[in-house]
Amino acid sequence: MLNIFNYFKNLRVSFHEVFSLFGFFTFMTIIVQLVSGTMLAFSSVPEPMLIPTVRDEEDIEDLYTDDFFWLHERGVDLIFIFSYFHLLRKLYLNVFDLETEASWKSGVFSFLVFQVVVFFGLVLCCTHLSEITLTIAANIFHTFFMFKGKAYWFLFTDKQLNTDTLIRLAYAHYVSAFYLSFLGLLHGIDIHYDWKNEPFYDGLSSEMLWWDEALSNELTNFFVLLVFITLAFFLLFEEPEALSYEIFMWGDIGLSTDVRFYGVAPHWYFRPFMAWLIACPFHKTGIFGLLFFFVTLYYQPNLHGVSDQNSYGKKTLTISSTVLAKKNTATPFSISIDSNLYHQITYFFFIMCCLYTPSFLPYGRFFNQIGGNWGFLFSYFYVFCYLAFTD
């Protein structure tokens, strides 16, 4: 056992940094979520008559064990934070090569399944968000069937928090969560074994060795960083409740009604999607617009070209004068992203637009005009244009 510990402790891979581990942090958090969620399942009481009582007491220990619920709740926050950082980092690096097409698509599909898992979980938590989340999920399901019949009844029954609904969503939440962990594992394998899309499998032994070393190094960095974070928060906060919603609630609507703050957990999970629904005049337009967003994100490698040869014909503007090509001729060498002025400017505006769109509060119909404003609409227009056309 000591030899195994020393092996992991001393193993280093020079090209793996902490900033490259957002995806790995996400997967590790999912594993913790499976453990805490399983413990919650052991103590779950699907009795709707208890919901008003626990809401009045502002505690849910009558439905679940409180510590595991707190751990599970904070884990969702971490998964969203890590997954958004991971996605934005990959968009910055333009990881759209032939070898990474499978890993990109499996990652986007995992991100979509994660939204479904959280939807089910928000209903099961039995807070003030449960009813509205249940209604939104049922309406989304109803929209795909063009409002014909009641196909949503199989999962959401009559859109009420009754015993039948809680049991069905509990099963759906557990099955989809374990399926998400399986997709995350496949995504990690796809991203490290980049020979997946190649017609031949040469160099398999060396790539497996690289995978083992990289994974060991990621585990080491993860646990070291986790220890420092634990010590920091142990010294800063005496009670674990201090890390609850307060860390996401900087600002008070009662003091400033027009404030645009980003951290109202758990509203901020779906704030970009909620803001999009505000901008759309019809509900079905907004739902299919969200579907179009995930389709665009899913086919990023196809939109930008998955062949290595495509990178030689791009018209780019960089800081370095030696890279500027005359008469748009192809450059025979690769261009660094850090020196690509065109990429830096377009990505900067992309981040600014991404920050502006979720600044609309989830109950934005009361604080912002329906349909948004010009800046809001332009931000969404730029986001879609960046994902579709910008290399």
UniProtKB/Swiss-Prot annotation:
The keyword tRNA processing does not apply. SUPFAM superfamilies: Transmembrane di-heme cytochromes (SSF81342). It is found in: Mitochondrion inner membrane. Its main location: mitochondrion. One of its GO terms (cellular component) is mitochondrial inner membrane. Binds 2 heme b groups non-covalently. GO terms for molecular function: electron transfer activity; metal ion binding; oxidoreductase activity. Coiled coil: none annotated. Keywords: Electron transport, Heme, Iron, Membrane, Metal-binding, Mitochondrion, Mitochondrion inner membrane, Respiratory chain, Transmembrane, Transmembrane helix, Transport, Ubiquinone. It comes from the Eukaryota. Heme b b566 binds at H86, H187. The chain crosses the membrane at residues 22-42, 67-88, 103-123, 169-189, 213-233, 275-295, 341-361, 370-390. It is a multi-pass membrane protein. Heme b b562 binds at H72, H173. Its cofactor is heme b. The main subunits of complex b-c1 are: cytochrome b, cytochrome c1 and the Rieske protein. Heme 1 (or BL or b562) is low-potential and absorbs at about 562 nm, and heme 2 (or BH or b566) is high-potential and absorbs at about 566 nm. This is Cytochrome b. The lineage of its organism: Eukaryota, Sar, Alveolata, Ciliophora, Intramacronucleata. The gene is MT-CYB.
